[in-house]
């Protein structure tokens, strides 16, 4: 156990509990409080030493967060919005990545591969940040579903695109005949592993009525699906997402009466622990970045490009659905735009950039600055926007127009 910094982690979790209590009393977003607390902790003469690594984020903290988010989704609502959220996730990530990559290359002068890697890693909104924020605010059901679903899906899309670009940056020179199958396998394989693992787990769960066993088995589903997919070069994020959706959507048929509530409660607790560590560590690491680079021209340009890319990936795509059953009211579009928070995934991918990329250090610093802006500025103002747009629970949701009839 000597390799695990138990005392520092315990200290950070104690701070997280105090921040949770204080944030609720002050009516501030919890994740904003965590980042600020982490920043202040890092300025202390003797702060807890818990390094924020790619492996810690990607292999330890992300699987339970993605799984829990998918587990809590309403399967019927998710399926109903899937045509819309799929387009926003796939096309949206591509548009945002192109905007950011082009800007960082032509304006800042980064190499194409460095700009492309940054464009992809920062294009996806982070489900951890988005879902934590929206649950706290009590946003209306449909806008929450669209934002959360799109965030979960584009998470997986961005991770797959990043893996392809990383292979190129590391020296591989795959042609289209290799890239396309690899991309499709990463997507399809991730979903396949998630479905297979979750169904196998549910078959075992159906043979017990012990809630503790049920919780343990769902824990194996979360990490097992993620690690298995990664082992076979598929998307672990999509695998954990698929497993969570399957267990959340069909688990009621297999879980015992006592197990249903306890499984969900256990996963809310796991997510609280992972969320707490992720955002405190983000704050600590932002404080440890070189001060001059935090306000550099590259960081400012990146923030502006990220916002521009997000806008171009939301408003035109939403317009394409304006005469369909998936029409998004303007208030929803504004919420999707400003609610596109960045977080742990962007940092995990930035830390995984190959050393052969000349801008690697600059990309890491710029990613930290962009994430900090996203959480502190966008996250802090989201509750006000939700209230302003009258999208909080208790207000009537805007009506969805029926498809226009032909002729």
Which positions does each model-derived feature cover?
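Transmembrane helical cores of multi-pass secondary ion antiporters/exchangers
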Residues: 1-407
């Amino acid at each position: 156990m000597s390799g695990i910094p138990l005392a520092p982690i315990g200290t950070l979790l104690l701070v997280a509990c105090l921040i949770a209590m204080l944030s609720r009393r002050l009516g501030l977003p919890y994740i904003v409080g965590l980042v600020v607390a982490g920043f202040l902790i890092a300025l202390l003469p003797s702060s807890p030493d818990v390094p924020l690594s790619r492996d810690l984020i990607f292999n330890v903290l992300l699987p339970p967060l993605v799984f829990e988010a998918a587990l809590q989704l309403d399967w019927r609502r998710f399926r109903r919005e899937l045509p819309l959220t799929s387009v926003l996730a796939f096309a949206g990530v591509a548009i945002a990545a192109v905007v950011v990559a082009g800007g960082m290359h032509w304006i800042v002068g980064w190499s194409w591969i460095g700009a492309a890697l940054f464009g992809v890693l920062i294009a996806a909104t982070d489900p951890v940040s988005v879902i934590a924020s929206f649950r706290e605010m009590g946003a209306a059901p449909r806008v929450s579903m669209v934002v959360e679903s799109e965030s979960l899906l584009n998470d997986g899309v961005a991770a797959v695109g990043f893996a392809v670009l990383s292979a190129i940056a590391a020296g591989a020179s795959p042609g289209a005949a290799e890239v396309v199958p690899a991309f499709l396998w990463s997507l399809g394989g991730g979903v396949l592993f998630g479905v297979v693992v979750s169904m196998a787990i549910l078959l075992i769960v159906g043979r017990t009525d012990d809630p503790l066993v049920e919780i343990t088995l769902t824990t194996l589903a979360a990490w097992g699906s993620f690690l298995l997919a990664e082992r076979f070069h598929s998307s672990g994020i999509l695998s954990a997402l698929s497993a969570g959706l399957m267990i959340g959507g069909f688990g009621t048929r297999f879980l015992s009466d006592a197990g249903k509530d306890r499984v969900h409660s256990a996963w809310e607790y796991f997510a609280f622990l992972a969320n707490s560590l992720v955002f405190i560590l983000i704050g600590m690491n932002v404080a440890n970045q070189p001060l001059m680079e935090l306000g550099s021209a590259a960081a400012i340009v990146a923030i502006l490009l990220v916002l521009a890319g997000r806008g171009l990936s939301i408003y035109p795509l939403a317009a394409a659905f304006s005469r369909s059953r998936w029409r998004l009211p303007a208030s929803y579009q504004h919420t999707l735009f400003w609610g596109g928070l960045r977080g742990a995934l962007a940092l995990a991918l930035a830390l995984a950039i190959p050393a052969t990329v000349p801008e690697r250090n600059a990309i890491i610093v710029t990613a930290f600055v962009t994430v900090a802006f996203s959480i502190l500025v966008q996250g802090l103002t989201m509750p006000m926007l939700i209230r302003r747009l009258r999208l909080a629970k208790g207000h009537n949701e805007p009506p969805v127009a029926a498809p226009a009839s032909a002729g």
